[in-house]
Regions:
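Conserved functional hotspots at enzyme active or ligand-binding sites that engage polyanionic ligands
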Residues: 1-123
Length: 123
């Protein structure tokens, strides 16, 4: 597949499991908006591909007891406040929307996120 041919890796190439500050505007409906952290969930070969897209989950500091969310506590992922990963809000964004790398989540947290995505998508 042409879109999976890799580009040269640069310091700004996101890696699966990293949290980045991203600009998600403009949005529609109930999509998360504004500048906010996002968790990269796409595989690294895709992240380095000519597609110039990355698959992310928005992160919010508005904590709600919703079963498909995953709670992260600082300093995990470079976050400063307790936050929820919105597994129900998976989306592809242009890598141009990524502003700053904040950090990486622990393998255990990523495993929980992966389980929630599997349930949501019926995989």
């Amino acid at each position: 597949m042409e879109f999976l041919k890799s580009k040269a890796r640069s310091d700004t190439t996101p890696t699966r499991g990293e949290i980045w500050l991203a600009d998600l505007d403009p949005t529609r409906g109930h999509e998360q908006a504004g500048r906010r952290p996002v968790l990269v969930v796409s595989e690294d070969p895709f992240n380095r591909s000519k597609a110039d897209l990355v698959i992310v989950l928005p992160v919010t500091s508005t904590l709600r007891p919703i079963p498909f969310r995953v709670r992260l506590s600082p300093p995990e992922g470079g976050l400063k406040v307790e936050s929820d990963v919105l597994c129900e809000a998976i989306r592809s964004i242009s890598k141009d929307r990524l502003l700053t790398r904040l950090g990486s989540v622990q393998m255990e947290s990523m495993a929980v996120v992966e389980d929630r995505i599997r349930i949501l998508l019926g995989l």
